[in-house]
Amino acid sequence: MEMLLGTDIIEVDRIKRAIENGGRKFSEKVFTLNEIEYCESRKAGKYQSYAARFAAKEAVSKAFGTGIGKNAAFSEIEILKDSLGKPYVRLSGKAKEFYDSLGTAGISVSLSHCRAYAVAYAVISLGDSFKNKI
């Protein structure tokens, strides 16, 4: 089985400044309402949560091999948590169409942060049909 990998690291203060200076316009362009609700509920760690999700979106887009833009918008890559707290990705729009076209078998993400930085990794597992796409 082949895999596509993506990673990203970001300074938490960069996201904090973007949210404070760009307000809802920035937040709603980059994050879904579910993500905003979750991050805002994390009072003390809200900016770390936003930054980790931003990094995860970048990591997924890098695993796609295209980055944000042509095949995926930030708001089309949603980072959620399951009942155990494990992060997972929900795609929509162009991002989902592109993902489905790859012949994938799954996508996994891992997020982490400290006070100053957030990092994320994305792994897209490819099915046998991917070999026919190259």
UniProtKB/Swiss-Prot annotation:
HAMAP family membership: AcpS (MF_00101)
Coiled-coil ranges from the UniProt annotation: none
Protein EC: 2.7.8.7
Family: Belongs to the P-Pant transferase superfamily. AcpS family.
GO biological process: fatty acid biosynthetic process
Cofactor (UniProt): Mg(2+)
Protein name: Holo-[acyl-carrier-protein] synthase
